[in-house]
Each structure stands twice: as C-alpha cells, then as structure tokens.
C-alpha cells in the first residue's frame, strides 16, 4: 500500500512527515528546513511558496499569509486579475509539501492525513478537505491537532491509564483538548479553543508597542507605512523568539522612516517583563478555554496525569508559567512543538495503512449540531464533545395545517437562538401530503463521519420520501468548482515545473559560457587558432540566445557549444597527459645520470690462492 503522509497545515508554518521503519519522521523541504512558512506569493504569474515568499513579502503586495484564518469563509483575494479562495491558496502550500515528500520518498504521493484545530467547525473542515483535493491529494482523514500531538508522543506504549491535557497555541489558533488513554485507545473527552488567537497576536502587541513608542518620540505613525510595518513584523517576531531565551533584546531598525531633519531610526530595548505585561491578556485568554475543557470533561486539574505543549508559541515563558499555575503540572516537552502535530498525523497515516497497530483514535465533535425549530429556536441533536463517528435521529412535525414542505436549517454552535449560531446549510423536504399541523412525522438524522464532516437526512415517515445533503456551507465549493481548481492546480504545477527547467537551462548555459572562457584561456597557443575561434563563435552565439531568452535556441546553442568544449577539453587532457609523460621521462633520465655520477671507483687487489 502506498504511503500516507501526515500534514500539519498551520497558520504560520506547515510541516510534513511520514512513517519510516515504524517511526514518524519529518520530511525536510528543498532548503533543508523541517518546517515551511505558510506563505504564498505571486510575481509575474510565477508562484512562490515558503521562505522565498516570506522574504520578499516586504516588497511584493501579492503575498498571502495566515490564510488558514479565512478557511470556511467566503473570503477571496484578487491577485494579478484572478480571484483566489482560501482553499486554492492552501492547496498551493499543500502541493509544495507534497512535492517535498515525493522528492524524499522517490515515489508519487496521493494520500494524506491533514490536521485541523480541534475547534474548527464543519465549514472549516470541509474547506481543508477541498484544499487537499485541489492539491491532488486524497484526504484519508482530517484529525484534530491536539489529538495528533498525543499520538506523536507514543503514549500508547505506557501501561497505565492516563488523562492528558493538550495545550496547543499555534500561529493563529488556540486549542485545548482532554484525552483519556487506555490500552492504545485515545479517547478525546472534551475540547475547547479560540480560532482567532495565536502567535500572530503576540507579534501584534509588540508591533503596537513599537509603533506607539516611535510616534511618541517622532510624531510619525509607522502603522500607515506598509514597508515599515513589514519590517516591524519581522523584528517583533524575532524579539518574541529571543525573549524565550533571554530576559531582554535590542530592536534596531535603521532608516525606518524620514523626518524634516533626515532619516529616522528605531532603537529600543524590550525586556521580557515588558513583553509579559503587553501580552498578559492574551495569555489569560488561553486559560478560559482550558477551564471549560476541564469542566466539560468533569475533571479537576489535580486529576490530570500529564500536560503536553504544542505549537511554537508555547515556548513563551509566560505561557508555560500560566499553564503550570493553572494545572499544577510541569508541562511535558519531549518533542519539538513545531513538529509534533505533523508527526502525529503521520502516525494516524500509519494506523490507516496498517503499519501502526494497537492504536485506536476516538475524537469528538467540538460544537453542538442541530436544526432551527419554531420561533427561531436552536434544537440540538448532537451535543458538543460527542465521540465521532456518530449518528442521531429525532422526529419533528409541521408547524401549519396542510404544509406541503419543510425547510431544514442546519446549524452548529452553543447559543439557544438560531440567529446566534453558524448556519451550515439548508435544504427542503417537499411533497408532504396535506394534513393538520403536528400530524406528519419528519425524522431528521445527523451523521458525523470520522473527519468531523456532517451529513443530514430528512425523511417523511408517512410516505418514506427522503432528502439528504452533505453539509456544504455558503462559502463551500461545489464539486464542479473543486474539479476546475484541481485542473488549474495541475496546470500551474506543470507551469512551475517548466519554469524551474527554464531557470536550470539558463544556469547551465551561463556555467558553460564560464567554462568555455576557462578552457580557451588554458589552450591559448597550444591548439590551432581556428579551433579556438570556433569555440569563441559558438560561445557568443549562446550568449546572444541567452540575451534574447529564446529557450529552444538556448538549448540548441548550448548543445553545440558543449560538443566543441568537450573536444577541446579532451585535447587539454591529452596535452596534460603528454606533458606529464615527458616530465616523467626527463625525470627518469635525470635520475639515471645522477646514479652514474654517484658511482665511487674502489681500489682492489686480486689475491691468488696457493694450490
């Protein structure tokens, strides 16, 4: 069976892993890094992903970051006259990770397990699945990030029963999950979180502080300057990371702006204490979902056996201190928090292929599901933190006499009124026979699969007429749209490959020009001038083709020059061999002469024996 890769599609960074030799292993990207920034940039119709896209974000307005925050919404971004959905941008990142995995494994990869924040709703999960399809991946399973992290720790190898709290503070989302582990079964008991809280927000408080300090000193608002703002963002991110290891850091941004007297520089010392003061309310915001998850699980902090930290932002000392204070437990930090989720996704991939045995994952739905009933009331059919997959049915009736149809309005959330919850979709059950209100029996069934994706059926028990939908939110993509995007993504991948080959061809041509100059110089006066002239002429023809950027011409001229240079190189080699042979002959003669010169004539006397 082909390998199933595990992908952590993060807000700020993404990571890909695979099972190898019974262990999950992170796959490095072409630059050799173990995580890839979730950044996509477009430049002259060329797509750039990862570090290269992040580096030029300052000068390129067509750069998209933190697109995960828009998954499951109708957000679109226009780039070079074309509109892109969050699913398409995410698919570009997934394609990049898929290519890294294929280069590493030496085989085509078509299947993946992708992780999502535990608190992602149905629309966000469906959007993630669509992104996978667009990238050419069959998404075998969508699993929650905290659950994946628990899998990565290999805790199923422990004999005793354990209750684990996973605290996951990523770049743009925050989740906390409580899991119960016994006999290789990971059962999620409760989950809570905030999809609008993460490391980006910690960066932002530093940026706001820098902007305020600079304005106080120079009366210039840097937040209005796009270039300055990008430099501030980079500096804030670096300062945040520095303050995890040291108690103060220097922020130095020369020529950040200009005033009447000339250029202005930003110089500021940021202490860990100041950073903790600025971010105190963000840290506090993570504790409320932590308390809610414990309450939903019916546990007190003292009943926890272990606390696991996930996500780069958990390196912040104030965050570690807060969770330690809240749970009374020293957080367990055995695996790199940036990689642990991808490793867990790879383990789940191994479970699905049969490479990993004795592990069973039971996840939960993060939000309650139900329908709108009379008076705009939200009637729950499936309560939050119900183990999935699951199915639940309930019988409803009509609200008016002779009502020919019922509208089924499917919602997800915790509020009592429908208007305050998120609409997942609507559909209609028609052709209900005329009858007084309250008589028709309409059975509504909710199914949630192992990916947390919802299917809803409505059935008239009197006529057995049935209507069903797989929930597709207003921002979701139809199958036709996904198929179109898949074709576009494949075409773009081909175009990207073609562009890569073009760049490599130009590089090879430039290298050959340099090599020709060197060979011609080395052969000066040693071969026929006509041969040197022929090589020089072919070199100039190749340079002209490079100038014109005619690829087929570059290829033809390169091949022609390659042949000439090869012949010249052979001659150069032969001459070097001949010179070496001559030098060896001369050395041999010299050694023989030296031996002759060193002969000493000895005097001797012949003694005749007496017979």
UniProtKB/Swiss-Prot annotation:
Residues 579-598 are annotated as: Disordered. The keyword Electron transport does not apply. Acts as a chaperone. Belongs to the heat shock protein 70 family. Residues 579-592 have a biased composition (Low complexity). Keywords: ATP-binding, Chaperone, Nucleotide-binding, Phosphoprotein, Stress response. It comes from Bacillus cereus (strain AH187). The gene is dnaK. The modification Phosphothreonine is found at residue 173. GO terms for molecular function: ATP binding; ATP-dependent protein folding chaperone; unfolded protein binding. It comes from the Bacteria. This is Chaperone protein DnaK. The keyword ATP-binding applies. Induction: By stress conditions e.g. heat shock.
